[in-house]
């Protein structure tokens, strides 16, 4: 069971800026869902996540914990220490209440995103970026990875999703990518001090 993959705060910020600049309503919900779907598709096609981190099966669907924590920190003015060096406070402007949007004030650092990261983010934005809240909730609730997490931890308010479940019911799966993910994960556990492209 893989419930957390390594993540790079700078890459996460770049992905968030990229998404926020390309969707019409860059809310916490929309940014989180597009990044989740980006990882969901990228893992199936390439055997590694774009962003990684920990995903939880929350009532409105899968949520990347680090994205949620970062966006909540921007709202409250209390950004987590792992993001202090990213300059995120000057790169995304929080606007509106009670459902704030996150408007990019800087361009993403494209050097942190690979060609395949950009390919999949563009694909996911084109396919899901115009979907409304209810359609995204309904779709992500139907994914086996979401349902299995809720079944494994029925009493939890934020059950952890298993990355291995991302392959089930995923039409983007390329043969061999699950094994590649497992091998990359094993390497990241063996060499935690190194940032691996997992």
Region spans (language model):
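Domain-edge interaction signal
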Residues: 1-198
């Amino acid at each position: 069971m893989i419930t957390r993959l390594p993540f790079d705060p700078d890459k996460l910020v770049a992905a968030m800026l990229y998404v926020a600049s390309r969707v019409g309503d860059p809310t916490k919900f929309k940014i989180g869902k597009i990044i989740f779907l980006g990882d969901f598709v990228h893992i199936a096609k390439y055997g590694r996540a774009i962003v990684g981190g920990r995903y939880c099966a929350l009532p409105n669907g899968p949520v990347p914990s680090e994205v949620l924590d970062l966006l909540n920190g921007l709202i409250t003015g209390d950004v987590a220490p792992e993001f202090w060096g990213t300059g995120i406070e000057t790169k995304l402007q929080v606007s509106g209440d009670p459902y704030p949007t996150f408007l990019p004030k800087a361009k993403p650092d494209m050097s942190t995103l690979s060609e395949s990261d950009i390919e999949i983010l563009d694909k996911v934005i084109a396919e899901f970026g115009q979907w409304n809240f209810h359609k995204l909730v309904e779709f992500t609730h139907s994914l086996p990875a979401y349902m299995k997490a809720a079944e494994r931890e029925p009493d939890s308010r934020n059950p952890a999703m298993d990355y291995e479940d991302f392959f089930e019911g995923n039409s983007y799966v390329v043969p061999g990518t699950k094994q590649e993910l497992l091998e990359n994960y094993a390497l990241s556990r063996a060499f935690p001090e190194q940032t691996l492209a997992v």
